[in-house]
Amino acid sequence: MEQFKGLQKSLYIWTDNAELDKRVEQLKTATGGEVALENVHRLSFASYASSSFDLIVIECAQLTDNYVKLLHMLKPSGKLHLISFIGAAGSLLQEIKLSGFINCSEDSDNTLTAEKPGYETGSSARLSFAKKNSSTLNVWKISGDDDELIDEEDLLDEVDKQKPDPASLKVCSTTGKRKACKNCSCGLADELENEKKQENAAKQASTENAKSSCGNCYLGDAFRCSSCPYLGMPAFKPGEKVQLVDNLLKSDI
């Protein structure tokens, strides 16, 4: 009992009243404080306030589910001391731990000691992980003393500073008229050349297949219509093949 010296208020739970006064006096002497008495069979009917005792001593450990009640009766960091217990110490310690006690141990004199946590049941505490570390927040903070700025002018070469030739900025087919550049590399020059060849071939075919609608074209200009394709050409024999030049079908204006 020497480890309980200085505890002011204790509760002694008894089963056998033989020499009860002697045991109570020994507890008073060891603690130096007040000692209250309670029968183990009347414990469930008792109405003690929470955090009433610094120490609870039990003669018999046959309490079933009353360990939780003892936990509420003890003050924070209060002690629970079991003597003359029945059964295996390991299973009894496990039951006490599950009731909320800590630092449960078996003493050398075949007694068990446990402790209530240093806080009240149902109490809360503010968690520290919610705090923001100010040094972490300043990691990405830009400071003019720590950063070296680069002059933008140093990023440009002399060639970059020269003004470009406006002629070099023109792109094929962007000036309103489809006309290829001098050094065309986009394929527009080849496309225009193919279109020109197709147009000339179509005109050539139209002149070769020209037919007379009036039947008087071979007689000469005096007998030809104003839109005759043979206008201006000498007379020829009927059925004779005549080759027309390209400019005959074009307007003079």
From Swiss-Prot:
It is found in: Cytoplasm; Mitochondrion intermembrane space. GO terms for molecular function: 2 iron, 2 sulfur cluster binding; 4 iron, 4 sulfur cluster binding; electron transfer activity; metal ion binding. [2Fe-2S] cluster binds at C172, C181, C184, C186. Residues 130-161 are annotated as: Linker. Keywords: 2Fe-2S, 4Fe-4S, Cytoplasm, Iron, Iron-sulfur, Metal-binding, Mitochondrion. Residues 214-228 are annotated as: Fe-S binding site B. Component of the cytosolic iron-sulfur (Fe-S) protein assembly (CIA) machinery. Required for the maturation of extramitochondrial Fe-S proteins. Part of an electron transfer chain functioning in an early step of cytosolic Fe-S biogenesis, facilitating the de novo assembly of a [4Fe-4S] cluster on the cytosolic Fe-S scaffold complex. Electrons are transferred from NADPH via a FAD- and FMN-containing diflavin oxidoreductase. The C-terminal domain binds 2 Fe-S clusters but is otherwise mostly in an intrinsically disordered conformation. This is Anamorsin homolog. It comes from Drosophila willistoni (Fruit fly).
